[in-house]
Amino acid sequence: MKNSKKKIRPAKFWPVIGFATLAGMRSMSAPAFLSHYFSRQPHAGLDGSMLRFMQKPLTAKALKVMAAGEMVADKLPTTPDRIIPPVLLGRLLSGALVGAAWYKSRHGSALGGGVLGGLAAVAATFVSYALRTGISMQTATPVALVGVGEDALVVAGGAALLRGLQLAQGEWRPM
């Protein structure tokens, strides 16, 4: 019998699906959570990459401010639906960014991760839009109030995703 060691491959697929789902719900939340993680747990896979900016603490702070601003702006009556093409494109790009950065950090293909993240973000956009509008119509609850619940789900989901990631080293400070 052979004595072989099984090589443990770092998780790539499911974390991207998680981050991209966040991007479909709130476009800036996924990059904010991922950059927060990378700023505390830098990965050699991003060294020398155009995506290395995601590891900078200033990037993490700026993305958190933008994510908070998006959550406020989402409740305004003039905010367009997430499924119109320009807004949908932003969510696709956000999902592609987190997918590419995560795959690259795990020494994978940034292109493959970007495609996966972008497609998952688009799917999550349509699902979350249908859920939000459906809940609002079925319960006669204002869409903005349902949006507050969606914000809570995004924050809780992002925090759970970060806690679930296998940590490479050092002390972890979730938020």
Name each model feature, range by range.
Residues 1-175:
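Short amphipathic, positively biased membrane-proximal segments
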